[in-house]
């Protein structure tokens, strides 16, 4: 069982009590020093009148970050990791792990990086050159040709992502030479994530798995737009190479483009520019 403690003022404790009111356990309080006690799933939290807030349980990482989000506690350094390209037929899968120090958070907030999911591709192309010299990041891009080799060997998308995230997190930790919170935008359960990594020589395990992680810490938002920037550059390069402006996503318009490319260049070219296990391709050209 893991545990963690905060020190809060009374207004902060009141806010937490209000947010967690459905989990309060009033009948178990028999100590005058306790302000409130609650149970949420397998996690216990105790707030003391002196401001100490104690949390314990097996999987407390996400709850710790949730509390920081509730109280708008953002002034801590962290590594955030995110990926792009996983929903696009064309182009690479890009994973980025970015370290944002507490000192650089205001700079990124002023650029509205925290709203990364709302940024247009045009805005991302403008912003990324402004931030890449302010933060430490590690990035890897798996092109479609290599992706297709891996999937043919039995790797599923989540396993590929887990391996890439683990590698980039480890690489970034070596660069910054310090221990900080590591936050990953959750794409599978922690159990599955580490199971995908069971054959890796080195695995980083102190990870906070969070839904909508870019809202938890701006380092994830930074990783997201840097990865998107690299992905877009890859799409532009592939488009230039074959003389076609490749479409993003996996829509019916993409289906039409796949069919056109197949008729003009054949499957060998598709294998180099597209993720061939996507239904957009398998339903047209690969029969069971």
UniProtKB/Swiss-Prot annotation:
What is the role of this chain?
Answer: Endonuclease that specifically degrades the RNA of RNA-DNA hybrids.
Checking PANTHER family in the record gives:
RIBONUCLEASE (PTHR10954:SF23), RIBONUCLEASE H2 SUBUNIT A (PTHR10954)
Q: Which CDD domains match?
A: RNase_HII_bacteria_HIII_like
Instruction: Name it.
Output: Ribonuclease HIII
Q: Which GO terms describe its molecular function?
A: magnesium ion binding; RNA binding; RNA-DNA hybrid ribonuclease activity
Q: Which cofactor does it need?
A: Mn(2+); Mg(2+)
What would be the name of the gene that encodes this protein?
rnhC
Q: Where is this gene product found?
A: Cytoplasm
Q: Which residues bind a divalent metal cation?
A: 82-83, 185
**GO annotation, biological process:** DNA replication, removal of RNA primer; mismatch repair
EC number of the protein: 3.1.26.4
Any one GO cellular component localisation term in the record = ribonuclease H2 complex
Catalytic activity from the UniProt record = Endonucleolytic cleavage to 5'-phosphomonoester
Stored SUPFAM superfamilies = Ribonuclease H-like
This entry's comment on the bound cofactor is:
Manganese or magnesium. Binds 1 divalent metal ion per monomer in the absence of substrate. May bind a second metal ion after substrate binding.
Specify the RNase H type-2 domain's residue ranges: 76-288
Q: Which UniProt keywords apply?
A: Cytoplasm, Endonuclease, Hydrolase, Magnesium, Metal-binding, Nuclease
Regarding protein family, the annotation reads: Belongs to the RNase HII family. RnhC subfamily.
